């Protein structure tokens, strides 16, 4: 199962962590995994490359985990929150369609 955690800090999303494999299908044919990967890459690329936010991104191949953490001060906070909220809504819709393969939660 893929586990997605959005970090909540005072009502704003301060980052996310995505880990695990969905197990929906074999590697290369797993539409759940492909959808999660696309949402994560879109959000991370938009935040760092388009908006220019110096977010910290860590990838742990052994744990199949990617974590993105925003800096404490962010000039384009509204845009970043819109991107992360869109990512969260997209992944929640995916979870609703495939509840056995992905979980999405907000953590403090």
Model-predicted regions and their roles:
Residues 32-36:
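Short, conserved glycine- and acidic-residue-centered signature motifs
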Residues 1-31, 41, 45-108:
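N-terminal intrinsically disordered, cationic/polar leader segments
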């Amino acid at each position: 199962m893929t586990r997605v955690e959005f970090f909540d800090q005072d009502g704003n999303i301060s980052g996310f962590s995505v880990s695990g494999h969905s197990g929906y299908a074999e590697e290369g044919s797993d539409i759940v995994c492909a959808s999660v990967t696309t949402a994560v890459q879109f959000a991370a690329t938009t935040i760092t490359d388009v908006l220019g936010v110096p977010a910290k991104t860590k990838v742990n191949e052994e744990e199949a985990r990617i974590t993105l953490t925003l800096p404490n001060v962010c000039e384009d906070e509204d845009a970043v929150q819109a991107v992360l909220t869109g990512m969260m809504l997209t992944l929640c819709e995916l979870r609703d369609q495939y509840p056995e393969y992905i979980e999405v939660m907000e953590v403090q």
